[in-house]
Design a protein with these regions (language model features):
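Gly/Ser-rich oxyanion-binding loop with an adjacent helix/lid
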Residues: 1-37
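C-terminal nucleotide
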Residues: 40-173
Length: 173
């Protein structure tokens, strides 16, 4: 019930399009039916020993972004979900993420520079739509290689995380 309320607030305030559903289920998921938890549906893909490393340079207004680009987002997004449902591959997801970011025109020159450098080093990456943010889902043993590259960009904030397959929950009482 709480997650359904959070979803409604997210939509009303235009702060996201399905982030609550993803957070609720956790892990790497493909949203095959939009909506709040209990209404929407995801297909979970269990990934083990994967790190997510990202660099964020600046935020963007999510509500402004959604308002300006929603028709383009929905057009290509649905087609990409179908492709991803076939492959169920996180590397393919990152490739499509880059394609999608270019299509909705969110790539800044600074982001493109990072993407190019990662690509030259055979590191796949994608674009998060909550700011000037590049992410990479990589096997844990390859973390140092990407961190070395990203640390050159002192104007960005680097975040390293693990993929949590459990989803939102109360950690402490």
């Amino acid at each position: 019930k709480v997650a359904q309320i959070a979803h409604d607030v997210e939509i009303e305030c235009k702060t996201g399009l399905g982030d609550v559903l993803a957070s609720y289920y956790g892990g790497f998921e493909i949203r095959d039916k939009p909506g709040a938890p209990g209404i929407g549906h995801v297909q979970k893909i269990t990934l083990n020993k994967i790190s997510i490393i990202m660099i964020c340079f600046s935020p963007i207004s999510t509500s402004k972004f959604i308002k300006e680009r929603l028709p383009r987002i929905n057009g290509l997004g649905g087609k990409m979900v179908n492709k991803l449902l076939e492959s169920k591959n996180y590397e393919h997801f990152q490739e499509m993420s880059l394609e999608f970011a270019k299509y909705v025109d969110v790539m800044t020159p600074r982001m493109q520079k990072v993407v190019n450098e990662l690509s030259k080093n055979n590191i796949k990456c994608g674009i998060a739509l909550f700011g000037e943010t590049i992410f990479s889902m990589i096997p844990k043993e390859n973390e140092n290689k990407i961190l070395e590259i990203l640390e050159k960009y002192s104007d960005g904030i680097i975040i390293k995380s693990e993929l949590d397959n459990t989803g939102a929950r109360v950690l402490y009482n």
